[in-house]
Amino acid sequence: MKKEFEVISRIIQNNKRVLDIGCGDGTLMEYLKRNQHNDVRGLEPQKDLVQKCIAKGLSVIEGDAEKELIQFPKKSFDYVVLSQTLQVFLNPEEVLNQLLRIGKQAIVTIPNFGYWKVRLHLLFKGTMPITKNLPNQWYNTPNLHMCTIQEFVDFCKKKEIKIEKSMCLTNEKISEITNKNMTYKNIFSQLGIFLIQ
């Protein structure tokens, strides 16, 4: 299991209701169900990945989160997980609003467009960077709204979204993001991980 999922699983308590949006092949869901006894559901737009999840015995529906989340009742989950998916939505603000409506808490992870390798690539090559967390060319990327860790934190403050925990991942190492180290983490972190409500 990738390090990001390990961090997410440590945030989520046992025996809780969890919705994983953009759940992929169900790796995180499977772990949360088997090891933490969580009641886990998934929402995934790709039919082949939905079929992989179902083959693992996971409860997943095929659908577009921007259209389907409105159908979930208010506070119907303890946690809603959105892992490296926020940037692909046409309206990420509305998706965040829906996460916070249907979940008591949400865990959002974002690839950090402020990472120093991304900055240098843009500066010296003048082209969109390709990294571990941003593996696509500009013309075939699903990413529409890239942001930095700092921008996400600023957005949450502006919208009065409470950040309960903020961490970052760099080269498989996890560390906490604080007001004092924000500038440093915004430059040297590949991924931001946030627990919000």
Label each residue range with its predicted role.
Residues 21:
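Conserved beta-strand/loop positions that form the S-adenosyl-L-methionine
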Residues 79-91:
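A short SAM/SAH-binding and catalytic strip from SAM-dependent methyltransferases
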Residues 1-15:
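Conserved alpha-helix/loop element of class I SAM-dependent methyltransferases that forms part
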Residues 70-79:
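A short acidic, Gly/Pro-enriched loop at the edge of an enzyme's catalytic core
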Residues 31-68:
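Class I SAM-dependent methyltransferase SAM/SAH-binding core
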Residues 94-98, 105-197:
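S-adenosyl-L-methionine-dependent methyltransferase catalytic module, highlighting the catalytic core
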Residues 25:
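Conserved SAM/SAH-binding loop
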